[in-house]
Amino acid sequence: MKFINKLISLIDVWGPTPKLYGWYHLLCLALTVALTIFLIRKFKDCDDKTFRKMILITWIIILVFEAYKQVVTSFNTETGTWKYLWYYFPFQFCSSPLYVLPFVAFLKEGKVRDAFISFTMSFAFFGGLVVMLYPGDVFQGCVGINIQTMVHHASQVIMGIFVAVHQRKKFSKGFFLSAITVFAAIVAIAIGFNIVGHILIPEQGLNMFFVGPYVPSALPIFSIIYPLIPWPVFLAIYIFGFSLVAMLICYIANLIYVKGKKDENKAA
């Protein structure tokens, strides 16, 4: 156990908190753009086997970084003690790729897999994009956590765009709307977590997806709405709001795809 504690102390390195649009933030944004362009140019028309491999590799990377985060946030290097903080349990909106990407990688071709693909290019992409553009309080003094959060959210953006480009021929109203089904199912699971957490560990204020009926939402805009209306109404607005943004992303993606096809036809 002492060896494990020492090992964690070595990887739990602290330094200055990165600034919003400081050198570290800008570097991460630049790498995100560069890698997105590279993947689109190199693999936009790759076969399904290669596509699945890339999804799987991405999932493994973010899973390893998430495991690191869970260990570091649970260990107190000063006292050498362990305590799991359920606040860090990976079932938030931006954690969804941890659970969605395996379905994209392993499910057989069909409508169910398409729903997870659609979710990845819309809901998951949106979650990553928001944090990449405005990290807010995700930056902290722990160097490893800062790397983890940028790798994770950048992966959401990169995979969101890459998946959209690679799966562009599937674009349709039904394909896009299927993402809402996945989102609603995940939110339902999150609510279940929140209810159980309120019963078993009320002192930790568990609030997965910031949508629970017991703890006020901490999300921008939603934090203002939450205390003003009954929770069921808040939940409906929450699902509708996120779905509206996701469908807007799908609409923009489809516009780009249609324009690209027209340009190709003119060139031909």
Regions found by a protein language model. Name each.
Residues M1-K53:
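N-terminal topogenic module of multi-pass integral membrane proteins
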Residues A34-L39, V100-F103, S155-F176, A188:
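Alpha-helical transmembrane segments in multipass membrane proteins, preferentially the mid-helix core
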Residues A67-T79, V131-G141, V196:
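Juxtamembrane "helix-exit" motif on the non-cytosolic side of transmembrane helices
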Residues V13-A30, F176-T181, I199-I249:
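Membrane-interface transmembrane-helix boundary segments in multi-pass integral membrane proteins
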Residues L26-T32, P90-V100, T120, M150-I158:
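Membrane-embedded alpha-helical segments of multi-pass membrane proteins
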